[in-house]
């Protein structure tokens, strides 16, 4: 029996792909189980926050005395915690409290998380005012609390809330349209992670996401301090800080428009090993497909890479996996090596790559000889 390098490579690739698929199936099952049990942990975090608020109120009340504002704050926190716990139970199979901020790709959405944080804070602020209004006995105090909801005092925070919620909706629409238009590649994650808020799908930190989370978080802390100092009105977010948040949101949205891109084939050449003679592309030869965007972000695993297909004429060729320490030598984001099948008819044929995300590249014509 004669040794065939291409057959050996294909056998190794198929065995590796099968093993990787089994591991991936187990990982997906574990991810679903982890997500189903997440609602208990999120509910525990919510009630832990209520306990911390109670301790903070008790410590700061020493010397200053207990006030109606402290009671209203605790009552608002209890109502919020009960609502979040109920919502967590109804969405217990989808991540509990985190269900609304988990995207379609099973990752935490930065835009939804930031918007949700501001929505919860504004809801808590209004509940605090409602609690103080219910406890107020004098008409003058009630009028002062109602005037605390005037737009003139809360224009900054209302503007920020409206823009951030709009950004969350718009980003979902933009990403969906770009995926359908094959201008953005998305692959599903096994489970959401906290790092998703600051990184792209490949796990690399991105400037747009980081600055959006940092600036929005700083503004939220400032608004919380203002609420603690003046609980009789909506936090009056200064316009300078509000504009900073709006600029940060615009930067984040621009980053969403700029990320990704359609994979492209730049050239196709005959692969040449040491000692080979120069010549045309023939059936049975290996060809190198050079370009960009062949491996979608987050698809570096063997189970995802094994889904890549190259169309050579009418023949579909699965890309062989060539492992090396720390990853794979083939395929890579800029280079694919595949054999030309014997079923390809000699003549001019078109080569096209289908990535793991299902996105097709441009067609590139090459000449194949016998």
Map each language-model feature to its residues.
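Short, charged cytosolic
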Residues: 2-25, 181-192
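Juxtamembrane inter-helical linkers in multi-pass membrane proteins
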Residues: 99-101, 176-200
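Membrane-helix interface motif
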Residues: 52-63, 90-94, 124-142
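Membrane-helix interface and helix-disruption motif detector
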Residues: 58-74, 134-156, 230-239
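Ser/Thr/Pro-rich low-complexity tracts
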Residues: 258-370
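Alpha-helical membrane-embedded segments
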Residues: 78-84, 157-172, 216-229, 236-258
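Loop-to-transmembrane boundary segments
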Residues: 30-46, 106-120, 192-218
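Hydrophobic alpha-helical transmembrane segments of multi-pass integral membrane proteins
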Residues: 46-55, 112-132, 162-165, 209-223
């Amino acid at each position: 029996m004669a040794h065939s390098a291409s057959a050996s490579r294909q056998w190794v690739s198929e065995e590796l792909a099968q093993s990787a698929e089994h591991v991936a199936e187990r990982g997906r099952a574990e991810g679903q189980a982890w997500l189903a049990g997440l609602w208990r942990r999120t509910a525990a975090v919510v009630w832990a926050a209520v306990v911390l608020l109670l301790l903070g109120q008790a410590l700061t009340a020493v010397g200053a005395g207990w006030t109606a504002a402290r009671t209203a704050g605790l009552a608002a926190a209890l109502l919020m915690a009960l609502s979040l716990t109920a919502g967590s139970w109804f969405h217990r199979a989808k991540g509990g409290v985190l269900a609304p901020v988990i995207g379609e790709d099973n990752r935490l959405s930065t835009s939804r998380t930031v918007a949700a944080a501001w929505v919860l804070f504004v809801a808590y602020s209004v509940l605090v005012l409602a609690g103080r209004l219910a406890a107020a006995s004098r008409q003058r105090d009630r009028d002062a609390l109602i005037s605390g909801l005037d737009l003139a005092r809360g224009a900054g925070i209302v503007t920020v809330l409206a823009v951030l919620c709009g950004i969350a909706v718009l980003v979902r629409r933009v990403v969906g349209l770009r995926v359908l238009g094959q201008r953005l590649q998305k692959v599903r994650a096994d489970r959401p992670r906290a790092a998703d808020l600051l990184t792209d799908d490949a796990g690399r930190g991105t400037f747009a996401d980081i600055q959006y989370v940092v600036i929005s978080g700083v503004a939220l802390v400032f608004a919380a301090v203002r609420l603690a100092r003046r609980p009789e009105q909506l936090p009056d977010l200064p316009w300078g800080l509000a504009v900073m948040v709006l600029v940060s949101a615009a930067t984040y949205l621009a980053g969403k428009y700029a990320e990704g891109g359609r994979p492209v084939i730049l050239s196709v050449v005959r692969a040449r090993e040491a000692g080979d003679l120069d010549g045309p592309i023939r059936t049975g030869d290996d060809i190198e497909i050079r370009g960009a965007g062949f491996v979608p972000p987050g698809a570096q695993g063997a189970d995802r890479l094994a889904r890549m297909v190259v169309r050579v004429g009418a023949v579909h060729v699965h890309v062989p996996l060539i492992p090396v320490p720390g990853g794979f030598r083939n395929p890579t984001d800029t280079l694919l090596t595949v054999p030309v099948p014997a079923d390809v008819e000699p003549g001019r044929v078109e080569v096209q790559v289908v990535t793991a995300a299902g996105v097709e590249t441009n067609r590139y014509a090459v000449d194949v000889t016998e």
